[in-house]
Amino acid sequence: DPKNRAVFSAKVIGLLRQWGYDGVVISDDLGAAVALKSVPAAQRAVRFLAAGGDLVINANPGVTAGMVAGVKKRARADDAFDQKLTASAARVLALKEKVGLYDCG
């Protein structure tokens, strides 16, 4: 994808689904990644999830609130994005159940 880094590319992430992968797509660190400095932290999370990612990894606690706010804002404004988040949450919960981490009690 010449227009997007792989982490933000629906084309690249979509290849996983085309090849039959139906599991959770997890980012590398999006919070402190030097290679992504030019992208505002909130947009890093939004763009990864919009491209088809499921779970954002962030090693910089200073940008967590901004990432969460950015994702919430986009979800409120964009039904398709909100539906992607719902599907992502379902995949994450299914994985947790599969490995015995779903029940916290």
Language model segments and positions:
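Second-shell residues forming the walls of enzyme active-site clefts
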Residues: 1-80
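Mid-to-C-terminal alpha-helical segments outside catalytic/metal-binding sites
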Residues: 77-104
